[in-house]
């Protein structure tokens, strides 16, 4: 219940919940960066799809060049969250990894290219494992269930009803 148990623990505030979510994203970015670095080191093949060549241009290491921006985004996300949590620097959400699709889309392109260029074994190895983890865990590693003490919900509903239907009470 870390960060989500608001139905009996007065210490769990919205800022605590936000911090827990950021810590989870921080850890995810660190783990994904590590995995991407391993892939980049192992993908020395030159033969690739036109889709990758359009992005990388003529290079002897197209897969490495193609995957580096994703790895760098993981690193940037990890560092930005750490700077925010430790040094209280502002967090620019536009620079952070924001969806699992940001991870999966380039990995799908790499996998398709590897398969089309007779590298099915490589496409079905660590790359596929990383894709499965990204699909399963997304950018935060875990879902956070937030439990709120029920009188808070009652109060919120009362405020909505009071504002919207106050004029009907006098009829």
Segments (PLM) and residue ranges:
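Extended, well-ordered protein cores
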Residues: 1-14, 24, 142, 150-151
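Extended, charge-enriched "interface" segments that sit outside catalytic cores
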Residues: 41-168
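Extended active-site and interfacial segments that coordinate phosphate-rich ligands
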Residues: 12-38
